[in-house]
């Protein structure tokens, strides 16, 4: 029988990519104030922000769309769009005031060259721009932080001041041999004289400023800034401890001061993106006295503090250990008036049956409190799904708001006055926008969801979750009895499954997971005729803290064997074409892919690795996360304690090398396509070069794509589209059509 045709020409794959890549992604939502019509009806405006790939402009465009939700206090009566989508150019941050009458917008404008781009902070009222402040011209600070790690844009409760985070203004520096410009503005009878120099520091123009690593380049020393909307005066807050970098700030009750998270930056900064384990604590700075107060334990890591509507309590995520880089978190509650901190939801070592498996989100939504300031809503991975949960802060009881659904995944965008805005998707259904009211306590499982924007399902994609139990010889002695899962996607109704090729995709991290949500690359491959196996090996988030802790010290072994076990079992059960199995992985998924073609060379006919770790030992001195991180297992993931003030001994270096894919180079024969970002700070591209040269020396088919301005994620539109097409052609060449 003839093999299943994957594609006849590259143009077909490009056409398919063009169609599916048009699916927009939700990035944010906020709710306007409650409005009562002259006829007694009540409605709220839902303002949503989306992103979409534009292949003509080769960029991600941002656009907004508004919807109206008519309601009767506890249920949606009618909901629908209010006008068409509008592209928003230059918007970096936006936030409505507490009353909803004002809106602040941080906007960039100007050229693209160095020093040409400017930042403006605008204040809008109804249909007009009320104020516009040229932050760049005022020179009170450097660029404003727009990221979700440090960045914030917060209205005071009085709506008279705006709080944000920006880079600290650096002193001017000049050469010891700088020639002074002459002052030619003097009168004709005066001799030209040197201009009065600025207070520039001689010899400091090449001083090294540490930044916060991958995707945080040039962000080094954040400061808290307050803008007086009426006067336009900007103040840089004093009182922040010298040893921490502030971020995620908001106004304290009564506008008496500012609450913020402070991250330790001594003795040096480590990469912070995707690393929730960075030592940090909750602080309060009084605006009158300029003194700070520590509000939490300062030996752990915290994230996303959120003030309750009654301004009495703050919830935040707390991580019980500074290793590994991401893990199960506690939900903590700080009472503003009693100064008492309590743990509302604790770490879950292991999921029991269908019970809650813990909190794994890295950030709580900005809007997460119920109207009565008693309950908190959030989303979290639960095994291979992502669900919405509500927790009662008084009793600690956790209830799923989306259990028993169709098996897809949910993301909470915001909740305000008990009206929730959420996103829902599946591997075959792009994101849909939904709203629903949070039911009263005790009835939370009865949410009635209404669609504001319903996506069309992609036909001929079937998917399901496979539960996998490692064989006895692969059990972890310290954490025995752990299982793991994989999401299997396959083309609909093939004439003969034995002719269907399979692409295996282990996720990055290693402490992250695949969930049953929309993913462009797997959907594309499935539409082209591939089965796609997405493996959540032991160590993935969503399966309990024990699963996460089972992996450090066992990378390159436990995770590799889990993926291989999943592949063999699925091939055996589904009877896919065993002669056409390929690997595709990025970051730690690339690390595993390179391991698999070395440890199991007979299984795989082709491999695509994106920014893979190939030699843990050689990467330790160049990555932004030498301790343990999203894509490299330098020390902690290799099974050793990390310390800022010491170097590993020879045995540790040897063991890191022993756990690396490059150890298995002599066995590799699978054709490999490497894709590297030249600006990758997490896994420096030299890792891929090292592996590439080792394969070239042994005449193994290998091709290298080096993207000059791309970072670790390879997510720029031009890079992402090019890398996918090259991956497809690589699979076509080495697996056959």
From Swiss-Prot:
Pfam families: APEH_N, Peptidase_S9. SUPFAM superfamilies: alpha/beta-Hydrolases (SSF53474), Peptidase/esterase 'gauge' domain (SSF50993). Homotetramer. This is Acylamino-acid-releasing enzyme. It comes from the Eukaryota. The keyword RNA-binding does not apply. One of its GO terms (cellular component) is cytosol. Homotetramerization is required for activity. Tetramerization results in the formation of a gated channel which is involved in substrate selection and substrate access to the catalytic sites. Its EC number is 3.4.19.1. Belongs to the peptidase S9C family. Transmembrane segments: none annotated. GO terms for molecular function: identical protein binding; omega peptidase activity; serine-type endopeptidase activity. GO terms for biological process: amyloid-beta metabolic process; proteolysis. It is found in: Cytoplasm. The modification N-acetylmethionine is found at residue 1. It catalyses: Cleavage of an N-acetyl or N-formyl amino acid from the N-terminus of a polypeptide. Keywords: Acetylation, Cytoplasm, Hydrolase, Phosphoprotein. This enzyme catalyzes the hydrolysis of the N-terminal peptide bond of an N-acetylated peptide to generate an N-acetylated amino acid and a peptide with a free N-terminus. It preferentially cleaves off Ac-Ala, Ac-Met and Ac-Ser. Also, involved in the degradation of oxidized and glycated proteins. It is an enzyme of class 3 (hydrolase). The active site is at 587 (charge relay system), 680 (charge relay system), 712 (charge relay system). The modification Phosphoserine is found at residue 185.
